[in-house]
């Protein structure tokens, strides 16, 4: 166990935050030993798996950071068109998707290029371009932090929702995911519904894309919209897309006929948070050159809103986590003032 470790390499925002205690887990036995020794009970504990969806609000984390770095991918079973694959929690998510696509396995290709680790994916129920983790999730193994005992969680027990799971709410901090099992297919229809995908394929003359071509297209689309975290700190999409009642949406549509939307079950409508942010703005704040009345491209010294995607908040260096928190609050207020919609963070605030 190390003391006073700077977490800058362990969070994609690139903020300096000091962990009072820090331990890297490379084997499940190490985690169980840590629990047996009572270390997780002694300290306020943060389980960190990649750090790509975390915002440290303070300069010091007065507790223990447990960084999960276990590796391994194995085939559990293969039968006809289906294959069950297990990935350890510390596996890099984009690498795992790339591996599966390279094998010709369908089910997670639209989730390509989402930064993070496999173990964090179920916590957030990551999703993109019409696909969510829960669609291919079979089960996961997790260790209870109080006892060190291993438990298997089925899809139903995980209570997946939009960027939600039982690990993010009711059981937050009580379990550490150690591996995830995926049910994938050797042949399946590709999800090509989203406009960005259609436009990219058309632009590149691809009429009937292969699994690999779809994967590569999504990687290219994400690269065109998101900053390279090695150059500019960010956590990808900072806010969730709000889901509103159809009545509220119809009222908005009368005023904003071009508002994009996606129909949801039970009479709900999902509205892109990026569009709402881009079409509201910091009218009472100093604006970046060329930003007009939109948040898109807005900058306030160390932090700002990415110029290519209003949903992404960025850290240019030299700032603090609280700078992002304050910017997020201003954006939330401006969206609610203009559209009457509350947007909430997708990023985990620590």
Q: Which stretches of residues belong to each language-model region?
A:
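Conserved ATP-binding N-box helix of the HATPase_c
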Residues: 335
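Residue-level preference for nonpolar/small residues embedded in alpha-helices
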Residues: 30, 92, 269, 327-328
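Phosphate/pyrophosphate-binding loops and the adjoining catalytic core of nucleotide-dependent enzymes
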Residues: 331
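A generic alpha-helix structural signal
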Residues: 31-35, 97-100, 198, 215-218, ...
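Anion-binding (especially nucleotide phosphate/pyrophosphate-binding) glycine-rich loop
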Residues: 1-147, 151
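Phosphate/pyrophosphate- and phosphate-bearing ligand-binding catalytic cores of soluble enzymes
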Residues: 2-3, 8-12, 150-313, 318-322, ...
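Beta-rich strand-turn-strand
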Residues: 105, 321-327
């Amino acid at each position: 166990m190390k003391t006073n470790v700077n977490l800058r390499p362990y969070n994609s925002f690139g903020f300096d935050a000091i962990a009072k205690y820090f331990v890297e887990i490379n084997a499940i036995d190490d985690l169980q030993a840590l629990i047996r020794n009572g270390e997780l009970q002694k300290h306020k504990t943060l389980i960190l798996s990649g750090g790509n969806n975390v915002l440290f609000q303070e300069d010091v984390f007065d507790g223990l950071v447990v960084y999960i770095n276990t590796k391994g991918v194995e085939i559990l079973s293969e039968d006809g068109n289906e294959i069950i694959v297990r990935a350890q929690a510390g596996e890099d998510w984009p690498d795992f998707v790339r591996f599966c696509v390279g094998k010709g396995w369908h089910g997670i290709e639209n989730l390509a290029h989402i930064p993070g680790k496999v173990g964090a994916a179920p916590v957030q129920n990551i999703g993109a371009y019409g696909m969510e983790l829960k669609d291919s999730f079979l089960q996961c193994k997790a260790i209870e932090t109080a006892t060190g005992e291993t438990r298997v969680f089925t899809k139903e027990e995980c209570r997946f929702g939009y960027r939600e799971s039982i690990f993010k709410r009711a059981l937050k901090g009580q379990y550490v995911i150690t591996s995830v099992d995926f049910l994938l297919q050797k042949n399946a229809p590709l999800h090509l519904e989203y406009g960005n995908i259609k436009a990219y394929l058309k632009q590149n003359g691809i009429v009937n894309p292969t699994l690999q071509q779809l994967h590569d297209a999504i990687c290219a689309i994400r690269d065109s919209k998101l900053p390279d975290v090695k150059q500019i700190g960010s956590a990808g999409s900072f806010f969730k897309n709000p889901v509103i009642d159809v009545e509220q949406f119809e009222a908005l549509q009368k005023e904003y006929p071009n508002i994009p939307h996606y129909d949801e079950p039970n009479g709900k409508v999902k509205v892109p948070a990026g569009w709402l942010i881009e079409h509201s703005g910091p009218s009472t704040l100093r604006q970046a050159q060329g930003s007009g009345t939109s948040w898109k491209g807005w900058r306030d010294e160390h932090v700002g809103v990415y110029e290519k995607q209003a949903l992404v908040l960025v850290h240019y260096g030299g700032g603090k986590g609280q700078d992002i928190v304050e910017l997020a609050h201003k954006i939330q207020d401006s969206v609610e003032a203009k559209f009457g919609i509350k947007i909430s963070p997708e990023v985990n605030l620590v």
